[in-house]
Curated annotation (Swiss-Prot):
The gene is greA. Belongs to the GreA/GreB family. Keywords: DNA-binding, Transcription, Transcription regulation. PANTHER family: TRANSCRIPTION ELONGATION FACTOR GREA. GO terms for biological process: DNA-templated transcription elongation; regulation of DNA-templated transcription elongation. NCBIfam families: greA, PRK00226.1-2, PRK00226.1-4, PRK00226.1-5. It holds the Pfam family GreA_GreB_N. Necessary for efficient RNA polymerase transcription elongation past template-encoded arresting sites. The arresting sites in DNA have the property of trapping a certain fraction of elongating RNA polymerases that pass through, resulting in locked ternary complexes. Cleavage of the nascent transcript by cleavage factors such as GreA or GreB allows the resumption of elongation from the new 3'terminus. GreA releases sequences of 2 to 3 nucleotides. GO terms for molecular function: DNA binding; RNA polymerase binding. Disulfide bonds: none annotated. HAMAP family: GreA_GreB. This is Transcription elongation factor GreA. The keyword Phosphoprotein does not apply.
């Protein structure tokens, strides 16, 4: 499996979720299964089957997070050499030349992306189009909504 780029904050969020799943959610589900078993016949015991389904989801998510963390390439953006180019983890301000509006994005890992908070995934069309470019560059990016022309205004290593 390839390394998965992730910011320090993204790795911390996954560790927090993993801790919650292992130390809170998993024991809670085990208690629910034990309680449901006390109701008797397991074939027609909806509570038991629901708890077992929750257990499957929980264990699957635990494995997924552990795999991501074991393959994570954790990047501390504040320690990157400011090359003046757009790279993973930077905050980049662009002018959308189609609508003449300034937008600011931070390029993060897939699990960290949240477009409402201007956190865009490294694998998104916008991030892929901006990676490697520098201040002043004009970039034409194909998005699901059509082509958008951006000019890079500022690159910050925050």
């Amino acid at each position: 499996m390839n390394q998965i780029p992730m910011t320090l904050r993204g790795a911390e969020q996954l560790r927090e979720e993993l801790n919650y799943l292992k130390n809170v959610r998993r024991p809670e589900i085990i208690r629910n299964i034990a309680e449901a078993r006390e109701y008797g016949d397991l074939k027609e015991n909806a509570e038991y089957h629901a708890a077992r389904e929750q257990q499957g989801f929980c264990e699957g998510r635990i494995q997924e997070i552990e795999s991501k963390l074991s393959h994570a390439q954790i990047i501390d953006v504040t320690k990157l050499f400011p090359s003046g180019k757009v790279v993973f983890g930077v905050t980049v301000s662009v002018q959308n030349l189609n609508i003449n509006e300034e937008q600011t994005y931070r390029i993060v890992g897939d699990d960290e992306a949240n477009f409402k908070h201007n956190l865009i995934s490294i694998s998104s069309p916008i991030a892929r189009g901006l990676i490697g470019k520098k201040k002043g560059d004009i970039v034409l990016i194909k998005t699901p909504r059509g082509e958008v022309k951006y000019q890079i205004l500022k690159i910050e290593y925050l």
